[in-house]
Amino acid sequence: MSDTSELQRFLPKDQELLSGILYRIGYWISHVDDTDEGDRSEQVEHQHLLGCLNKISKAPKAGALLNEMAEESCRQEQSWPRWETKNDSILDDVAAAVSLLKSQGTEDEEKSFAKASMMVGMTVARAFREEPEHAVEHEGYFSWLTEKANDMILAVTDKDAHKDLGVSPEEDNALNDLLAILKS
C-alpha cells in the first residue's frame, strides 16, 4: 500500500468491507453454480479472479481507491477464508459498499466500483469456459475493462446472453442480481 492510503479516509469497519468486496464478489460468482468439475474449475476461477484484481490494481483509469481496493483484496490472503464464509451476505455487503461510495466517495469512484465489480463477476463466470483474454496491462486496460463491463451490463439484460457469453444460467442470475444492486 502507498503512503497515502485512499482507504484511510473510511472507518476501519468500512475499510474491511471495501478491502474484501471485490474478492468476495468473485468468490461468490465462482460458487453460485456447482458445476461438479471438481477442484480444477475452482482453481481456474480463483486464478482468473486474482489476475483480474491484479489488473484492476494497476489500471490508472480505475482510480486510486479502486486500485487500492483490488490491491488489498490480493494482498490480504490471510483474510480470504474469513471473507469466503460471508457468501450469504454478499449482495447486502455490495449494497453497503455502493451506499458508502455514494456518501463518502466520488461519482467516478462509484462508477469505477460498479464496472470493476461486474468485470470481476464476468471474469470468474467465464473463467472455466474459455482461455483468458490477453489484455494489455497498461493504461488502456481499464478502457478495455470498462468496455467489457459495459458490454456485460447490456448483455445481462438479455436473458439469452449467458449462452453467448459462456455463462451458466445460475451465474447469469447472480450477475443480474449484482447489477441490480450496483444500479440502485
Where are these regions (language model features)?
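Acidic, metal/ion-handling microdomains and their immediate structural contexts
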Residues: 1-184
